[in-house]
């Protein structure tokens, strides 16, 4: 129940952010940066709700797995998944690809995220210790983030920016 409530709140916030920009969900491209833990599960359930409302949602899996129930809900809602880790074990998704293909997938993920209207960051939660490492760090750095754990939770200021992509952190 707690995860579903967090996901509903995140989906509501995301829809509100897009509405503030005069964008209908069915006209938007949303990227979810999804980690393997419960924070990633929150993001997957939120992304599933947005996909059910007509948004074009792509989840970028930054780890070797995804929250099982969140992943199932997201796929049922029509969400697409891009796996970055060659050692990933995510049902129905490619794995075991070469280092060269992993680099190409990372570049694709960066391009897709940069072209989106909204990025939902659910890579890690409040339990992270230290800075991001590996694929999450590379992705965060490429998207203009510093890769360090935030001093406080990131919450949108609800002011219209006109700049895309907007970012919503699921903490």
Question: Where do the protein language model's features map onto the residues?
Answer:
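An N-terminal, well-structured beta->alpha segment
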Residues: 1-33
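Glycine-rich phosphate/dinucleotide-binding loop and adjoining beta-alpha-beta core of small-molecule
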Residues: 23-170
